Amino acid sequence: SRNNFVIKWIKKTKSYVELSSMYGLLRITPITPEVIRVSFVKGVTEKIGDTAWKGKADTAFSWNAKESKTLVEIATEKVTVRIAKNNGAVCFYNEKKQLLLAEKAEEPRFQEGRCNWIFFDWEKSEHLKAKGLLAADFMDVTAKAKYISYGGKKLRMPLILSEKGYGLAIASKGTVLFCGIRTFGPYIMAEGSQSDYYFISEKNREKLVEIYQRTLTLRYCSQAGIF
């Protein structure tokens, strides 16, 4: 039921903010001023696991968290994240406090077995693209259903880019399905033991891809200089 998503308690550490509901544990981690990690695991006793990608900020930077009766707000100089306490849905705003993206308030996420669905409220007119393997390769996924994972061959996260000035990088080594068809979602489904994605705020597409490549390649690949 929808009541399962109600936020019951909140814990802030130096690296992240955790919000717990009857459905599971949501963690918001500022990675850089432009990049926010959103992780979720189903179950009241479960913990967010480490992945092959960046789990927290490498370099300390300024961000703050505050709480009102209805909201939890986490802000860097570039991004403000608001989580509604009554449903656990996450909304992202740019530095001008303009809404860029919202998870669906009715049911923000669903987890069954190793399949994780995140439901988003994309605007009807919003143009969305998925990054391909080549630098200039972008596939239009507006109002379509497409597999956007690299089939396990490439050690990179699937990346969705919006003309509104943000990107979504999905932290899954398994299958990732993007569905922009309103009748069925819209949603992103990713395989894994937890739901994990990175929100990137940047208007310029080249810069956004640069941030994605610099910040969000696999830890051991960046250390070895592969990317």
Region spans (language model):
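Hydrophobic/aromatic beta-strand elements that line small-molecule binding cavities or substrate pockets
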Residues: 25-28, 157
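Noncatalytic nucleic-acid binding interfaces
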Residues: 1, 21-22
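Catalytic and substrate-binding clefts that recognize carbohydrates or anionic sugar/phosphate headgroups
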Residues: 20-21, 66-225
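A low-complexity, Ser/Thr/Gly/Pro-enriched, surface-exposed linker/loop concept
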Residues: 1-10, 14, 29-72, 108-113
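Extended Gly/Ser/Thr-rich low-complexity repeat segments
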Residues: 27-34, 47-57, 82-96, 224
